Amino acid sequence: MIDKVKKGIEGSNATLAIILINIIVYIALITVPNIADILLLDPDKILEKPWTLVTVFFSHEWLIHIFLNMGFFFIFSRQLEKLTSSTTVLIVYLTCGFIGSLTFMPFAPLIGWSGPVVGASAAVWGVAAAFAAMRPDFLILKGKAKHWIAALFVGNTVLLVLNPQIMIGAAAHYAGIVVGLICGYWLKIREQKRSLT
C-alpha cells in the first residue's frame, strides 16, 4: 500500500508544492484576521494590490472547495508532470490562473460585482485541459481525459445559464480551459517534433 502511494506521488514535485501552498493559504484565510484583504482579488482595488492577480488562484473559501479543486488538480497535474516536467506544470498553472484573473476583471462592472473573488479553478482546470490536449484518450477515473474537460465546459455553461450572476467566475473558468488547451496542443506539437529528431 505504501509503495503504491510512493509510486503515485513520485516525480510530482510541482504538483505537491502547489497543493501545499493552496493548503497553507486556506489555513491562513480561515485563521489570520484580515489576510483576505491582502490575498483575494478585488477589481476595485487592483491598482493598489496587483499581486492579487496571482494570489487569488492559490486561495479557497470553503473546505469542500479546496478538497475538490486540489483532488482534481492532483489527478491531472501529476500525469502532466510525468509527461513533461515540474517546470511545465508550474508555468501552465500560473499562466492559466493569471489569464483567468485578467478575464474576470472586465466582467465585474458589467454585472455590478463588488468585492473580492476567490478560487483556483481557472488554474486547476487549465492544467487538466493541458493534459487532455496532450493525451485526450488517457483514462482517468474510468473516463477519458477529453471527456472530463468537456464535462467541465458543459457544467460551467449550465450553471451560467441557471445563474448569470456567476458570469465572472464562469468567464475565468472558460479562460483557464482555453489557455490550458492551447498550452497542451503546443506541448504536444513540441513533443512530436522531438520524436522526429
Language-model features: locations:
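A detector for small-residue-rich transmembrane helices and their helix-helix packing motifs
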Residues: 1-197
